[in-house]
Amino acid sequence: KSSLPEGLLTAIALNESGLHAYALNLRGRAYFPDNRAEAARLLRAAGGRGMAGCFQINAGVHVARGDDWPLDPEKAADWAASYLAQHYETYGDWGRAVMRWHGASSQRAGTQIICRVHSKLEVAAPGSKLFADRCRPGAPQWARGRRNGAAHLEVAEAED
């Protein structure tokens, strides 16, 4: 994880799930179970297909059937760091790695996801210059994303 830019993993988790360890997206519907057992039950009921955990890992693609490791924040963070680093090595660009993370299918969609992550990065690592050249901090959606990220981070820190 140390080879990633400061705050990037936290910014991605803020963007993907609001740092909710058991968040699920099953067939386009969001679920926020109270515990891992309930989240695992819902994921199994969906046939192991869906986005799971604080990083919203695509369980149908990256997870063996019946396994629920994306619901373990530490395992998910280790996997996410490795996945991002692998794509950074391939592309030589953290923006492209984030686009690949999210599966952005176009440059426009890629820029949108990069800017959403950038707005959360301003909360996770204030003053970070990562992606600053790609996003307009004055845009309303950027400010909204930053406020949203700050609120989620405050709640997560209060629960620790």
Predicted ranges, named:
Residues 1-142:
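Catalytic glycan-binding domains that act on GlcNAc-containing polysaccharides
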Residues 146-160:
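Long, low-complexity, intrinsically disordered segments
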